[in-house]
C-alpha cells in the first residue's frame, strides 16, 4: 500500500499575504468549504494574533468547517499561542502552528537571541500549545539557511516537548532541488525522534523552484507539503497545490505516494481562488492555466487527434476541466441551464439558480452562444457575492473624439432609485464618477484589468477591479457584460457592496 502525503493548504494565511489581496470572512469561508471538497488535510486559516480581522476569519472557519484540521499560526510566545487557541477552540480538529527562526542571520539581526535562547523558546512554545491541543506543529523559520546540526537539535527538542509535525521551510526560496532533498535526508538521519512525527516542508518560489523542492523533499522522507492554490503568496508565491498533487499522481510509479486530494475539484478551486482574490491565473500556468491543454502546432494537433497521450500527460477531465457539445443560447431553457451547471460541478440553491438564470438570459440576448467560460464568469459575478445594497439599473454613456465623456447612471440603493450624471477623462472615469455621486462614496483605484472571457467580437468582457478604502483595505470586484462599460460599472458596484457588507458586519460584532 502506498504511503500518504498530507496536503497542508495555506491559501488563507500565506496566500492572503499576496500584495493587494484581502479576503472578507464570507470569502474565506467560501474558499474553506471548497478546500474541504478538494479534500485537503489541513487548512491554515490565518494568523489570529496579527489583527482582529485575521482572528475573526480563523474563528469563523474553526466554527463552521468540518471534516478537516484547521490550523492557526502563532509566533513562539504565550500571547500568540493563547490567541490562536481562542480562535481555534471550536474547531473539530484544531492545530496550533507555532514558529521561530533558526538561521543565524535571523537570530543576529531580527531576533537578537542566542541559539540556546531560541531553542528554549521553541520548547516552551510547543509545551504551551500542547496544553491546549494534541495537534501541534512547529516550524523552524528559514530552516534551509540554518546550521543543519543546530536545526536537528531544535527539532529533537520540540519533538520531545510534544510537537506532532515539524516543518522545514525554505523561507526565501533559496534552495536548489538536489540541495533541499539532501538537506531533508540529513535531518531525517540526524534528528532523534523524527520517525515519530510528520516531517513537513514549506517552499517559497523566489527562484521558481518551490514545487521542485517540495517534490525533492517528499522523495527524501517529508510527508506533508505546505502549499497554496495557484501558488499565490508573498513575493513570488508558494508551491502550487495543483502542481504538487498532480506531480505526485502523474509520476506515482516514481514516488509510490498518494494524497487524499479529489483531483476533479482542482480546476474549480483554482477558479474560485482567482475570482475572490482578484489574482488572475497566467495563461501558461501548469495544470489550471487557460493554455494548459491547448495545442496550436499542426504536428501536435495531429498527434492529439490520433492519440491524446502523444502530447497530453494529464487528461483535462481529471482536474475538472470538462468538454461538452451542448451549446447554450437565448432560446435555452432553465432545465438545460441547470443541467450544464451540474455537469460543471456547480450545486446551486433555488434562489441562486434563479439569479444566475436571469443574468444568463440578459447576456444571451447580446451573445449568440454562451460557453462554459461564460457560465463560470456569470456565476462568479452573481452567486459568489455579498448581499446587494447597490444594484445597477441602467447606464448611458456619451463619448467620442469631440465630446466630453459623460455618464448617466441609475442605481437602486436599498431598493430606492437614484440617478446621477458626471463627466470624466474617459467613459470609464465618467461612469465611476457618476457612481460616486450617486452613492456618496469614493475609493482609490489600485488596479483595473479587462479580459475577454472567450474569443469573438461578441465575447463577454470580464473586468476585475481593485479599490482601496480609507482604512487601506483593498477590495476586489468583478463585472461581466458584453458591454465593457457596463462590466466596469458592475465591478465598482460589486466593490461598494463588499465594503458596505464589511462595515455592517463590523458594527454587529
Swiss-Prot record:
Keywords attached to this entry: Amino-acid biosynthesis, Branched-chain amino acid biosynthesis, Cytoplasm, Leucine biosynthesis, Manganese, Metal-binding, Transferase
MF term (GO), any: 2-isopropylmalate synthase activity
Pathway assigned to this chain's UniProt record: Amino-acid biosynthesis; L-leucine biosynthesis; L-leucine from 3-methyl-2-oxobutanoate: step 1/4
Cofactor(s) it depends on: Mn(2+)
Subcellular locations according to the entry: Cytoplasm
Residue ranges, annotated region (Regulatory domain): 391-509
UniProt main location, coarse: cytoplasm
Gene Ontology biological process terms from the UniProt entry: L-leucine biosynthetic process
Catalytic reaction annotation: 3-methyl-2-oxobutanoate + acetyl-CoA + H2O = (2S)-2-isopropylmalate + CoA + H(+)
GO cellular component, one term: cytoplasm
Residues bound to Mn(2+): 14, 202, 204, 238
Pfam families reported for this sequence: HCS_D2 (PF22617), HMGL-like (PF00682), LeuA_dimer (PF08502)
Domain spans labelled Pyruvate carboxyltransferase: 5-267
InterPro entries attached to this UniProt entry: 2-IPM_HCS-like, 2-isopropylmalate_synth_dimer, AIPM/Hcit_synth_CS, Aldolase_TIM, LeuA/HCS_post-cat, LeuA_allosteric_dom_sf, LeuA_bact_synth, PYR_CT
Family: Belongs to the alpha-IPM synthase/homocitrate synthase family. LeuA type 1 subfamily.
Quaternary structure annotation from Swiss-Prot or TrEMBL: Homodimer.
Main function: Catalyzes the condensation of the acetyl group of acetyl-CoA with 3-methyl-2-oxobutanoate (2-ketoisovalerate) to form 3-carboxy-3-hydroxy-4-methylpentanoate (2-isopropylmalate).
Listed name of the protein: 2-isopropylmalate synthase
Species assigned in the record: Desulforudis audaxviator (strain MP104C)
